[in-house]
Amino acid sequence: MSQRTLDVVFPDSGPLISLARGGHLDLLLRFKPEVRIIVADLVKHEVTRFPDKYEDSAALSRFFRENAARMEIAETELGQFIIAQMKSRDAYENAPPETKAVMETTGAVPPKPPRNRGEAVILTVARDIGRRHPDDVMLIFAEDRYFLSESRFAERHTHILSTRAFLEGLARKNIISFDAVWADIVAKRPNAVAQSVDRRAPDIETDWESAIDEGR
């Protein structure tokens, strides 16, 4: 990848949930120590908000806690605003019936967070990284169609990678058995995105596989 620093950016929750449900979050630590692993604040909140309810949320909460030195959380004003909205809505949804009734009567029901909320947040994150580290390559690790679509997301110095393509790359290096790991994932998450997308940046040559530590 010709001396450029690689920033692995998670703009949507899909890859994290897939790897967590399959029991393979540790594969993210295959990136070399100099690689920045960046998770949007909204994405982290979404995948860790119900640790007492979902196994994958508990696994991700533990993973973030145990690897805090490795995982960089990108905070944005918009992300923090939407997180506050989500917390308010969750509090309402989990409130006792009498509390809900009062909130509904007084018009104090929190609004539902906007759909497609992650797109604006990741654009903010991507542009912030581009401003602070203009020579870095961003590896957008995603399952959302917005990011995997060739015509939708095309920031400079940006390489797009789907979960399946990531696993295929590790298999080419004989780090994993693709069939075994993918079977673990789809057994717990049948709707995991099966699309293999490994799209290089349009403006420079990029190669994420050279940032994988094969010696662990």
Regions flagged by a language model, labelled:
Residues 141-145:
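Short, well-ordered beta-to-alpha junction loops that form the rim of enzyme active sites
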